[in-house]
Regions:
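Hydrophobic ligand-binding cavity/cleft-lining segments
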Residues: 1-50
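Beta-strand/loop substructures that line and gate deep hydrophobic ligand-binding cavities in soluble
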Residues: 91-94, 101-155
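Short Pro/Gly-enriched beta-strand edge/turn motifs at strand-loop
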Residues: 35-36, 60-64, 102-109
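Hydrophobic pocket/interface hotspot
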Residues: 29-32, 39, 63, 81, ...
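Short beta-edge strand/loop motif at the mouth of beta-sheet-based domains
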Residues: 17, 37-80
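Intrinsic-disorder/low-complexity, polar/charged segments enriched in Ser/Thr/Lys/Arg/Asp/Glu/Gln
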Residues: 13-21, 26, 62, 76, ...
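A short, structured loop/turn motif at beta-sheet edges
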Residues: 26-28, 56-58, 82-90, 123-133, ...
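Hydrophobic/aromatic beta-strand elements that line small-molecule binding cavities or substrate pockets
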Residues: 20, 52-53, 77-83, 117-126
Length: 166
């Protein structure tokens, strides 16, 4: 089963919220968020690859990921985890970074509307033995255009995740 709800913008800053159901156990979907082999297969929009997914999946840990564009440009992000409840919830802050994990303001590279710290909350819900649902929420955007760009990329990523876990 594949259900995707539309993203929405709310409040003084804007957020992206995406809910998706999977024909897979919640533990398998949760694993896809922290297993480096899985993350390399789904954490990129169409046409991109993820050559680096150095996962340090623990509260206080920081993962380093790299998306490579079709023309070979590398874009690094870190995920710094503040809360992990197995099979229930992951909270992290995404930062754009250099290849060494040093964060920078996305506006410095022409990405106005993306905050330096993009808070992510992923909730997981079991819908039965082989069915689950996640909701991904990204917080802090200041531009409706960036919300739409992030939503489009997130939908592509989560569709790739579905192909892996189902």
């Amino acid at each position: 089963m594949s259900n995707v709800n539309n993203a929405m913008a709310q409040g003084p800053t804007l957020q992206v919220e995406l809910t998706r159901q999977f024909d897979a156990p919640v533990a398998r979907v949760f694993k896809a968020w922290h297993d480096s082999v899985d993350v390399k297969r789904w954490w990129q929009p169409d046409g991109f690859t993820t050559p680096v997914a150095n996962m340090n999946f623990k509260e206080g840990g920081k993962s380093l990921l790299c998306m490579r564009s079709p023309d070979g440009q590398d874009m690094y992000n870190t995920w710094t985890y503040s809360k992990i409840v197995p099979n229930e919830r992951i909270e992290f802050v995404l930062n754009f970074s250099d290849k060494d994990g040093k964060a920078f303001d996305p506006a410095q590279v022409g990405l106005a509307g993306i905050p330096k710290d993009v808070r992510h909350v992923i909730t997981f819900k079991s819908l039965g033995a082989n069915k689950s649902e996640i909701t991904v929420t990204e917080y802090g955007y200041t531009s409706p255009e960036v919300v739409e760009m992030s939503k489009a990329g997130l939908i592509q990523c989560i569709n790739k995740m579905a192909a892996i876990v189902q």
